[in-house]
Amino acid sequence: MSQSKQASILDSRILVPAIADAFKKLNPRTLARNPVMFVVATVSVLTTVLFIRDLITGGANLAFSFQINLWLWFTVLFANFAEAVAEGRGKAQADSLRKTRTETQAKLLNSDDRSQYKMVAGDSLKVNDVVLVEAGDIIPSDGEVIEGVASVNEAAITGESAPVIRESGGDRSAVTGGTQVLSDWIRVRITAAAGSTFLDRMISLVEGAERQKTPNEIALNILLAGMTLIFVLATATIPSFAAYAGGSIPIIVLVALFVTLIPTTIGALLSAIGIAGMDRLVRFNVLAMSGRAVEAAGDVDTLLLDKTGTITLGNRQATDLRPIPGVSEQELADAAQLASLADETPEGRSIVVLAKEKYGIRARDMQKLHATFVPFTAQTRMSGVDFEGASIRKGAVDAVLAYVDGGALQHGNAALALKTETDATRAIRAIAEDIAKAGGTPLAVVRDGKLLGVVQLKDIVKGGIRERFAELRRMGIRTVMITGDNPMTAAAIAAEAGVDDFLAQATPENKLELIREEQAKGKLVAMCGDGTNDAPALAQADVGVAMNTGTVAAREAGNMVDLDSDPTKLIEIVEIGKQLLMTRGALTTFSIANDIAKYFAIIPAMFLALYPQLGVLNVMGLSTPQSAILSAIIFNALIIIALIPLSLKGVKYRPIGAGALLSRNLVIYGLGGIIVPFIGIKLIDLAVTALGLA
């Protein structure tokens, strides 16, 4: 993957096969998929037959007819070449992926005893077979971890060298065939038979073998076919005007007029634009299951984003220590630091850092203190340390308060529990409520049954994310933050991040309901997820981006898979989708605008002998009627080659509103589509005349 990302359209490994493929695509069945180019190929065959007839019978203007014929075929070949280059980039990626395939042997298990396995060929495995994969083994096929935990190297799929953890029973249980276990062991239930693994699907998709035309492509093809039919009828009426004046127009000239007026530019590049859109996603390590998903991303109205890892860094950091009355900050900091010395969570490490940087308290040796660390559990929701007869705990406010009350009653201090600790409890609850309103998470600290205060943890909003949301807003996209936090915390983080709305205390059912509500309003919705509980919402969303680290159910439900498992990519995916639609629209505008200049080149040339007064339309001052027609047909072919890089790279994306974007593109590609042909045809005319070609 990483190597193929560097492939350029100037790479000989792509260009040379593309030239050969351009000739192979002259197959009528292949050409028939593109109505415009099929018509051009048909008239090219017709003019070739007429040229051969004239060559045999000794017709006039053979040199002119030969050149027109040659450039008509070049037009078809250049269109085929554009598509072949786009496909070639995908084939280069597919070849890179194929190299990661290895003939693997699998340890097929027939019982729960890990030592009892049978070595079989990896491609003989069936769905629901259970295999053992140990350190150094290649995972033989896609599957779900049902037992164990292991470090897995997924560089063959993602291009990232850092290993990832795969374990049973969570949202990191999916494994991909062709990846390697680096440490420990896992028991895997096979979920994909040979030939239908994730790697097989990737190869098939990036090659374009299964690429189907999207609804927008089909609609545009219908429009182009309709315009072609109109120009067929228009061209067919022209001989009658010539006959009325007592003259005639050669068929080769009529064909030249017809081919230059139909939208050959966009017709030639349409397929390449679609392939390149999916290719850009693949280079971004996102796999789209269909071109429809890429287009939908460009039309998205509502973006659902998980708070953790997307809007915030995901690792809550200690930002402040707030003691209750009668307790100093230093005392609270000392206790919080001791309780966190052996806590390897991001929150625990941040408390140690805060105590050192703000209060000058350095880390202490747990062994010298003869301390026993008390780990966090889901049942206690606390962690802490016991040493030298002292006991310190930190954790969720309600859990710590219950711990304090229980300890006071256990030692017979009922009055103390009811009076002294009630005052402290009120103070703790008040501080905790203030922190929650500010978008933070409170952790209460207690030492030997005495409440000391609260550690304020805060989800750090990612730098620049507010500006990104402002860009999306200018594009007319509504952003909704999805979080399990309480409404007060969610509102504070939403305000800081700059999202348009939020869904607090979200459940899978809430997400699904929100998506359906938005779609009922006629809006397209995009979201990302990685868990089995996200699968219904991913399937319902118009753009569902599943994380590669997620469950099999999530990956099957989404219509895109992010190989890097980075939720923030959802924003870039929308931008790539919009770039695809912008490129298609811009080049369609440019192609249609081209006709104006070609009209001024060919119409005067056709009728100059019959209607001399039409000479005023020769605003470009083209040398002769034949040079004008030849220059127009040459420009018509060369502009396809000139625009291949733009069709593959895409029009530059700018986060502005639809109205401003339309105005900008009309100026650049509409006005540019008029001016460029005037200049191009004139320069070609000068060259044709200088070389004596017409």
Curated annotation (Swiss-Prot):
Molecular function, one GO term: ATP hydrolysis activity
Residue positions binding Mg(2+): D530, D534
Gene3D superfamilies per record: Calcium-transporting ATPase, cytoplasmic domain N, Calcium-transporting ATPase, cytoplasmic transduction domain A, HAD superfamily/HAD-like
Localization: Cell inner membrane
Keywords: ATP-binding, Cell inner membrane, Cell membrane, Ion transport, Magnesium, Membrane, Metal-binding, Nucleotide-binding, Phosphoprotein, Potassium, Potassium transport, Translocase, Transmembrane, Transmembrane helix, Transport
Gene Ontology, cellular component aspect: plasma membrane
Keyword Iron-sulfur: no
Enzyme class: translocase
Reaction catalyzed: K(+)(out) + ATP + H2O = K(+)(in) + ADP + phosphate + H(+)
TM spans (from-to): 36-56, 62-82, 218-238, 249-269, 600-620, 628-648, 666-686
Membrane topology: Multi-pass membrane protein
Active-site feature positions: D306
Residues at which ATP binds: D343, E347, F376, T377, A378, Q379, T380, R381, M382, S383, K394
Enzyme Commission number: 7.2.2.6
Main localization (coarse): membrane
Protein origin, superkingdom: Bacteria
Subunit field text: The system is composed of three essential subunits: KdpA, KdpB and KdpC.
NCBIfam families on file: ATPase_P-type, kdpB
Purpose: Part of the high-affinity ATP-driven potassium transport (or Kdp) system, which catalyzes the hydrolysis of ATP coupled with the electrogenic transport of potassium into the cytoplasm. This subunit is responsible for energy coupling to the transport system and for the release of the potassium ions to the cytoplasm.
Stated family: Belongs to the cation transport ATPase (P-type) (TC 3.A.3) family. Type IA subfamily.
PANTHER family: POTASSIUM-TRANSPORTING ATPASE ATP-BINDING SUBUNIT
Protein name: Potassium-transporting ATPase ATP-binding subunit
Source organism of this protein record: Agrobacterium fabrum (strain C58 / ATCC 33970)
